[in-house]
């Protein structure tokens, strides 16, 4: 079939060649633009959050826009931060007031018995957030764990309580020696310590809490 003196197949072939050439030019432009963007240093990586220069860039993001996807480090969930242990002032109220945070005492069974304080935390390495990366996280309980388990101590008290093993384990050395010499107070002291353990009246001497078994 001839259209305007030219075969239709010839026109189709020319059209396909022109389309192929256009696609090649488009791919070349896209790849060139992508390589320029990859090598050039961006001024802004997100709206309102400027990325700094140097190897410590992740540690000095600036927070300027509340609508930015970059949040303050202090708003990070617990799984993205690492916190120090609560500061122990050992009952020194003056030191606690000067520092502004810390624990006067540790331990407690009920929530109302446990002191709460702020602790120093910092964002984990590799987590991008707006500075400062070190901050205070509030409402941390003043409790510590030193390897004492309730079930283990209860078994010690039940089977070896007459020899004071339970109190030796908890660090009450003086009363443990007395319990050993009297063979558990002829059974009375042994029974009383069982009740104290169950009711929470007998705890580790260092003020720590029972370790949780998961």
Curated annotation (Swiss-Prot):
Q: Which keywords does UniProt give here? A: Glycoprotein, Membrane, Signal, Transmembrane, Transmembrane helix
Taxonomically, which superkingdom? Answer: Eukaryota
What is the annotated signal peptide range for this record?
1-22
Which region ranges are annotated with the description Disordered? 40-61
Sugar attachment sites: 37, 92
GO cellular component entries: membrane
List localization entries: Membrane
Keyword Ribonucleoprotein attributed: no
Q: Which residues cross the membrane?
A: 145-165, 183-203
The record's section on Pfam families has:
TM2 (PF05154)
- Record's keyword annotation contains Signal: yes
User: Could you list which ranges are Cytoplasmic topological domains?
Assistant: 166-182
Ranges annotated as biased composition (Low complexity) = 47-59
Kindly report the protein's main subcellular placement as a broad class: membrane
| Topology in the lipid bilayer | Multi-pass membrane protein
Positions in the Extracellular compartment: 23-144, 204-214
Record-annotated TM2 domain positions: 147-195
Q: Which family does it belong to?
A: Belongs to the TM2 family.
The name on file for this protein is TM2 domain-containing protein 2
Which organism encodes this protein? Pongo abelii
